[in-house]
Amino acid sequence: MIIRAPIRTKTKSFRGDQMDFKFPSNESLPRGTLEEYHLNNHHLLNDVFAAENGVSRDEDGNSQILSDYTSTSNTNTNSGYSSNGYYSFANISDNTTSSPRIVINQNETARLTSSDSNKSDFFASHDFPGNDSLHYSSSSVVKNQLHSMEAIPEGNITGSISTAFQTIPTADNVSYDIAPSSASSLLPRKSTSKSAILPSTQEAKPMTKLNMEKDIKTIELNNSVVPKPKKKLNRVPTIRRVESSRFSNSRYSSSVSSKSSSSRCSLKRSKAIRCKGGLLYYFTSLGIKIKKKLRKLRLVLRRRLFSYNVQKVPSATNSKTTKSKANINNKSKKRGTNLVNKNSNSTPRLDTKFKANHPQSEDSKVGSNTPRSPLVSYTPSLRRTNSSIRRAASILTASATMTPANNKNSFISVPDNVSHAVTRNSSMYSRSRLVRSKPSTALNAIARQPSIVVENKVIPLSMNRYSIKEEDEYVIDTSSMRELSPVNSVCSSDYDRESSESYSNYADAMETTEVDNKDRVECNNEIQNVNANNEETSNEESYNLMKHYLSTVIAQRIMLRVQIARIQNNKSNVVYMNKSAETNSTIYEDLADSLLTEYEADGSSSQIFDGVSVRADEEEEEDEDDEDDEEEEEENDDEEDEEDEEDDEDDEEEEEKRKEGEGRNLAKEVDELAELSPMRKQSDLSITLRSPFAMLNSAYSNSIISLPTGVVKRSLTLPVGMKI
């Protein structure tokens, strides 16, 4: 049996087995709305860690703020302590210096001395209780009183006396030190330039009684100047590296004076540290000074622009009581509205950097944050990129509240009064069966529990595991399958009435089983007999009707183009613009009138077949519009005969149509039109098509397209215009 165990059981972040620590389950969390403090688990980590080991306050590897870069378990860094991803130095504490030893004096301060030089480091003994064994690491010694990252002077080769402010920070013992909120108030400005900084002596002398007394005095001075650091991190940790300008000038003087003692000192310096001084130090200090000045300017401008008077601004509790009194008494509604407006206008925007000054208790641990000041980690995590966080925290297309409750296939039940909100992934209100995401089509993205990202950690918001119902997306309904009876095409309207009464062409499969086979055979025989009789007549009628229709349309279009061509011709324009004696109007006016009357008519006044029927039956009386149309057609026929003789005056379109032979056969077709007088009586042009989707009881179950001839008009752009 294979037992799964982590490969690396010890990490620096927990100082113990990984399996000892368990994240608190979501069942222990309150069910109400959770703030960011409760969703964040930094304080839980620190409490568990502090309960297991008593740890010094300022040790940086313990906190989870910079866990990716400062932990030695991280394999992606260059050295064990990668100095938080910034400039890394050569680690000279490996093989060049001798191992330090710890001396504990009577006045309860431990001194770290190296045998090679008379260099001594002092650190407070309250960090190491007497009961525990001294877990000494070179980083904890320096960090206890180095509250800001000290820049290393260029030529500083250890003087005989070095205080806590002037040590050699290496990559092992000092990565960037995180200054707490009280770090700015740790060092008073007056005392740093004189008493806190001791000049380094030029000559290294052996330790005498006088030097020992001086050392004790310097220890007392340092302990009096540097107070104990406060224990809480109440704001965003900042990286402080450089002090005031006086301090930097004195640092340079001490570094220059210590060059003479370089021959007597046995400590080796690597070239990687020498590059830290000089221009790099100058520009970093200059940049920090400029930032401080800009922040002061910003504060001054804010105070003047946004009226920073604290006395005028009423507190939150007073405003709440005044609002409640106004609501209860209902006497001073106007005053209440004025107070609300004043509160909203005069309250300044608070900066999170200057907000967090709270009374602090000694029992609180490092890194435990209050709900008012959330910790923000600026180092990007190696395990989490932006895309992975988006992938893990996205609830596909929309949040769980977006799926409607009345949907049968939705696996999340939602109240009905859901506002149709527009979320990042779904612009439309999602009515789909499965909640899908636009970018990914993976199977694991179909349904995922809602989650939130706090400090680059994905925290699920529910313990429910939604099960996906196994349903087919493409449902085949067997009730919609129907057996189709044989399709029969019938053209006569008389038979349509008989067939609709006697036999339903598209009966349901269940209904047709009840009908006997004898009835089916009889119906089929009747249908075949009727079809045989009607096919001959219907074929002849449809042929004659379509021939008559197309010939008249083609003839009228040719006549119209002849008229337009002659009007556009300059030579014959004078003749045709003169008024004719018969109609007392020009040909151009007749053409315009004929066009207008046809388009204004509703299909009754200017019909193609009516004009043809007048030639067959001269006895019928017609309107004036129809007579004008007939006269135009007779004139245009004569003009077309003349046009056949004069080919030079015609357009290209007329020549193409003559090549096809339409102009030659036009006279014959006009003569045949007189023989089609019975066509006028039958006024329906029916194209019969049968489909299985036709309605059973409708009048149009016989044919999809039914065209009465009165609806068909002549068009200038299209060959035929129809209303279906």
Swiss-Prot record:
Residues 315-330 have a biased composition (Low complexity). The modification Phosphoserine is found at S25. Residues 617-655 have a biased composition (Acidic residues). Keywords: Phosphoprotein. Signal peptide: none annotated. It is found in: Bud neck. GO terms for cellular component: cellular bud neck. Residues 338-349, 366-383 have a biased composition (Polar residues). Belongs to the AIM44 family. This is Altered inheritance of mitochondria protein 44. It comes from Saccharomyces cerevisiae (strain JAY291) (Baker's yeast). The gene is AIM44.
